[in-house]
Amino acid sequence: MDVPQLHAIILSAGAGRRLGYPKALLKLNEQLMLPLICQAFKTAGCQHLSVVIRAEHEDLFLDAGLTARELVINPSPDDGRTSSLLCALQRVSSEHHLLIHSCDIPLISSDAIQQLVIQWLSVAAPEKTIARLSSPGGKGGHPLLVGREFVPELKKFEADQPLRDLLTHNKDALLNVTRAGDPGPFLGINTQEQLELVASLLDDAR
């Protein structure tokens, strides 16, 4: 079987209004999280990476080790999160399957991503399957793995259209992959309180 072409898209252009600053600038223990998120996807075997950012952050992330080829500038980031996805989709080949992730879920690990990919590959038609990690209690997590046959549908989305519409329209194609003992795929950071919670979990794990 041919090696699947996995294209990770990291959505990182949000203004972070509730957080108080752009989410791409999230730090834990004084370390920028976005480069670590990108490394997790590379370690998991993603051959392609598109990191969608605001124009004013380009130099910062070039200095942090990301490449110009990996960075995608969203010229209108306040149009909605899906506007960032649409920017990245311009780089996606018809052979690419997508792993869509948000930078405000920083504790994703390469192991979790690999578990998702392995389970997705085990189904009869991965290209026609959408997969996500889920908690033992059924809570959906991240990233979202989208088989290549759904990419044309995504390209028709409006800039302010929620990504969950893809799941709503294709319920029979959804594969939930249970991930136990790992809060990383389910912990989003939208407020200072959530940031402090995640930081405390990291401190407790030391």
Where are the predicted features?
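Conserved alpha/beta core of the MobA/IspD/sugar-nucleotide pyrophosphorylase nucleotidyltransferase superfamily
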Residues: 2-4, 152, 156-206
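Residue-level signal for inorganic ion chemistry
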Residues: 10, 22, 34, 49, ...
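Short beta-strand/turn micro-motifs composed of small residues
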Residues: 12, 52-53, 102, 134
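Short glycine-enriched, charge-decorated loop/helix-capping segments at active-site entrances
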Residues: 22-27, 74
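Short catalytic helix/loop segments, enriched in acidic residues and glycine
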Residues: 26-38
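Conserved N-terminal catalytic core of the sugar/cofactor nucleotidyltransferase
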Residues: 35-100, 110, 118
